[in-house]
Amino acid sequence: MKLFPLCLSALVMSTATCASSVEGAIEKVPQSLEQKGPSEMLSMKPDVKGGFGDRMMFIPFQSDLGLHSPVDRSGFEYCGYLDAIESEDGDSSRAPYAKLQLKENVEGIARFGLFYHPSPFQAFKHIIDNGGKYSGLDRVFLENLRKSLVVSLDSAVNRTYSIPVEDEGFYCFVGYQEVAHQETVIGENSEPIVTIEFDSFNSNVPVTLKLQRQIFLSFSIVYGLISLWWAIRCICSRTKLHLVQVCLFCWFSFFILNHPVKQRIFSIDNPDEYLVPFVVSCFTYFLGDGIEYALYSLFITTTVLGFGTIRRTSKKMVLFFSLLTCGQAFLVNVAPMVYPLLYISGSDKACVLRMVWVFNKFLYLPLITFLGAVLAFRFRLKKASQFDTRWNLFALTLAIIILFAFNDLVIFDKLQKLWKYDDTTLEYLKIVNGGIKFVAFSILLGPYSKLFAEPKSLQLDDFLGKHDGHKDPSLEKF
């Protein structure tokens, strides 16, 4: 199992940098960011026992705050995935820690803050969301950093500082330095000054672990029964499944797997097990953030555009939506892992990739919702005498979708920030939020099935191009 951290480091750093060492990572920094002076005085010293040197990344860059300063003020970033490595003497009472120290040939002050993410995959998403925030500091960010410093190393007072690392995850030390360079031996500037040392976690099992298991198991059973009851009810109804019903069921099935079922399966007695955090992280990233998000986006798209509810669709549209879902899942999984490499190498494609990412994450669903509302209102004016009931249902569904979007962007986002260090509470919030969505949408889709019980014009056979001769004039294309 001791080989596992090395395998994980290869995965993490293959997406963030192609270098196998700190020197290799610095060589890939664009010349506009590369500094050959004081910024090279902050680097990394791998701990031989931990074998951590080939999976850390140090990136220096020039800060615009040093234009009128008598001493050079340059920024630095230092990122890596810290995990627990069992010490040779078997002592498990000490947690891992990061020890940072100024070199002997440095006079000045280094100020920096610590950023932490439990999952390296999620950290990549934060990087692309913020446009490479961890590889650059602007004026506003530096001012905020100065007000809430974690560490301030002063060569006249203290050259060394140790930060305890109590949780596994992706750590970034981001800050700037005010140093005066001294003449020294050739090649000494490239020597590392930051030391990372490891000890295993305390193996005591949390008292609340059994209670958490019971809660996640209860969520899994209750949500599974709700989805099963709803699926049987739809299948046994007089009408066949509609497209939006299929999309809703697929999304909620993956939601159950990604949240309560995952948490129940991977809640183990031994928190020192290396494989579990990595499996949970991969499970959430590829299945949850990729497939689950794409399926939820597909459900919202088909609902707001009225396919299967207020208008007829076709075999080509089903194929188009399938390809769109695959494309979104691919983008969500791959883009955050490719973006750091493009950003560090100075490629112009990094900006294009981030624009596509921002559009898909923040603009796609609002634009689709607005387009669906415009088309439905146009259809309402055109088919006023035949569309009253369906229009009222669609308007209510659209209002609920907008309400849930507001909840996700404002209320739920603030709750996530409030409990950002409590992963269990965050999972509870996500599970409850997803369950409320499913119940609300399943209730709203019920009246549509009753409307189409007699003329089976919106059955799944129609979606596949198999018509039974019935045709609803209110569902003509417009």
Swiss-Prot record:
UniProt KW keywords: Endoplasmic reticulum, Golgi apparatus, Membrane, Signal, Transmembrane, Transmembrane helix
Signal peptide start-end: 1-19
Record bears the keyword Iron: no
Chief location: endoplasmic reticulum
Lumenal side: 20-214, 262-289, 339-356, 413-427
Membrane topology, Cytoplasmic segments: 236-240, 311-317, 378-391, 449-478
Transmembrane segments: 215-235, 241-261, 290-310, 318-338, 357-377, 392-412, 428-448
Cell compartments where the protein resides: Endoplasmic reticulum membrane; Golgi apparatus membrane
Membrane topology designation: Multi-pass membrane protein
Protein name: Uncharacterized membrane protein C569.06
CC terms in the record's Gene Ontology section: endoplasmic reticulum; endoplasmic reticulum membrane; Golgi apparatus; Golgi membrane
Highest taxon of source: Eukaryota
